[in-house]
């Protein structure tokens, strides 16, 4: 289905912003749920707000939708301030995790509901509903009722109902959270394809890192009411700007310590457990930065960047001895847990290339290059 099928998109200009939040706060009975959130969402972008439960992400989405009013700050959609605009007049539609379908209406009547509220003519309504059904591949289920279709099909109907109204921005509140793992992955691909076909701006809230990474153009990582970092999935994963982001996005090995010295190309950190670990100097808080001797830092090393060997490798840096504590066979890859002699535990993830796995308690060596070690300030500047 192309962009013109539902007459949703105009010619996209990804240098323009569809949504702008300007130092937005939200206070509930003395508790500040959103603390000065400030970001732009570009036209036609798939933008995700990612964070743990209670971080303020759903409140932020509800502020954009108009279901909540900011305590301070401003929300702008398509260049217009929404300060005095109620939810029903905003150019947005929302897909909820619960789908909120009308059980007494058929699939096609659920999709047509908003069009009928707008008093569109019968012929135009039927045409738009048919296009929406085709978009989500639900033509054969048009006359069924919500209790006669699966959870994944209900999700498609909710999506079609939101898109048929031609919103400038589609808001998605954990839309795949009620689906099982296999169906969720399938729907991630379908949702991404629909976004690419239509060019509508999607704003999704989720706590699922894999979900956000697989579908988003950019991700805003939220923590305790604040935005920790905004970037592409690759930027967020490879260059986190705080220990929280490094730990929340995927798996990582974290070491706390103090900088012993640096020479403008690398730095050496003495960890709290006594290890001397080399890191690349330019990788400070995910970007070029300055860090000095005596500074407390957190080092992050991704499990897939760590090598594992039964024998001492021919390397001069970041090589440590330990014993194999646990092995988790995952099919395409294997997770190893190694207890270092220092007392630290390390996760190692390697592709499944061996037919046999080492026995538990086997002496092992873990090692990694300084280029794969990221130094992070304990408090994000």
From Swiss-Prot:
ATP binds at residues 51-58. It comes from Trichodesmium erythraeum (strain IMS101). One of its GO terms (molecular function) is ATP binding. This is Spermidine/putrescine import ATP-binding protein PotA. CDD domains: ABC_PotA_N (cd03300). SMART domains: AAA (SM00382). Transmembrane segments: none annotated. InterPro entries: AAA+_ATPase (IPR003593), ABC_SmlMolc_Importer (IPR050093), ABC_transporter-like_ATP-bd (IPR003439), ABC_transporter-like_CS (IPR017871), Mo/tungstate-bd_C_term_dom (IPR008995), P-loop_NTPase (IPR027417), PotA-like (IPR005893), PotA_ATP-bd (IPR017879). The keyword Cell membrane applies. The gene is potA.
